[in-house]
């Protein structure tokens, strides 16, 4: 057998360059679970602002919105060119995915006013009904469960309950933490919407745990044993008896 000639310096550098390219591509894929999407954030308080920052870091485009969008200019400037500012109507039209992070009493009006823009879209709902803030409708939503209630308020969307069971301060401090990541419970009726939501949870720096359909969202509603608890995925599954 004829001995193989040793690689030339040029050949070695070519191989190293190829290996580096493959490694960088794999690292990029691992860093962003969801293909880059446009996310319209309706309600840019602490929750909405934190998620906007986390998703921009992961390569997604966001539109942050409020009733007074001029007040969001400094946040948008800090987030960079992947962030835009608009009204709630603008965000509803902009996003292929919608993040709803408003006081719960506003949910029915949003469903009514932006039904056309939201139709058929994946909507992540982080709202929680608090009677002291939202009035009697919150009592009814708690009795029925936030999942079925939001589904009624937001007809025609592909609804997923998400990010309602973590306080705003923990979104930035706990995202991508070392070791086992914090879990975010999800519930929805649409498997494809749940898959999209789970990918965006990972991109935000957390581990998704699918609890069930929207009727099961009450298991992580306000007042549930796991509400706002910092649990890993295995701890959350154990607490909710999810196999």
Locate the predicted segments by residue.
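A glycine-biased structural micro-motif
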Residues: 36, 94, 120, 156-159
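Bacterial N-terminal signal peptides that target proteins for export
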Residues: 2-17
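NAD(P)+-binding Rossmann beta1-loop-alpha1 motif at the extreme N-terminus of oxidoreductases
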Residues: 29-74
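Bacterial N-terminal signal peptides
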Residues: 14-26
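Internal alpha-helical scaffold of NAD(P)-dependent oxidoreductase catalytic cores
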Residues: 153-159, 177-217, 222, 226, ...
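Rossmann-fold NAD(P)-binding glycine/threonine-rich loop
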Residues: 127-176
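Rossmann-like NAD(P)-binding element
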Residues: 80-122, 126-134
């Amino acid at each position: 057998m004829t001995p193989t000639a040793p690689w030339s310096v040029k050949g070695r550098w070519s191989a190293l360059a190829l290996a580096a390219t493959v490694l960088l591509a794999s690292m990029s894929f691992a860093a962003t679970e969801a293909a880059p999407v446009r996310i319209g954030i309706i309600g840019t308080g602490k929750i909405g602002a934190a998620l906007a920052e986390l998703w921009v870091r992961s390569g997604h485009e966001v539109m942050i919105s409020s009733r007074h969008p001029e007040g969001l200019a400094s946040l948008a400037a800090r987030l960079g060119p992947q962030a835009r500012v608009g009204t709630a109507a603008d965000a509803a039209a902009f996003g292929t995915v919608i993040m709803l992070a408003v006081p719960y009493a506003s949910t029915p009006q949003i469903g009514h006013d932006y039904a056309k823009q939201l139709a058929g879209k994946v909507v992540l709902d982080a709202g929680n009904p608090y009677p002291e803030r939202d009035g009697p409708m919150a009592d009814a939503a708690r009795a029925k469960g936030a999942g079925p209630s939001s589904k009624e308020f937001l007809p025609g969307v592909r609804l997923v309950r998400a990010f309602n069971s973590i306080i705003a301060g923990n979104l930035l401090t706990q995202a991508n933490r070392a070791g086992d990541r914090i879990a975010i419970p999800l519930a929805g009726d649409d498997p494809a919407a749940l898959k999209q939501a789970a990918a965006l949870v990972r991109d935000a720096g957390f581990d998704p745990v699918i609890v069930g359909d929207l009727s099961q969202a009450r298991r992580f509603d306000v007042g549930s044993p796991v509400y706002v608890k910092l649990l890993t995925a295995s701890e959350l599954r154990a607490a909710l008896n999810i196999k």
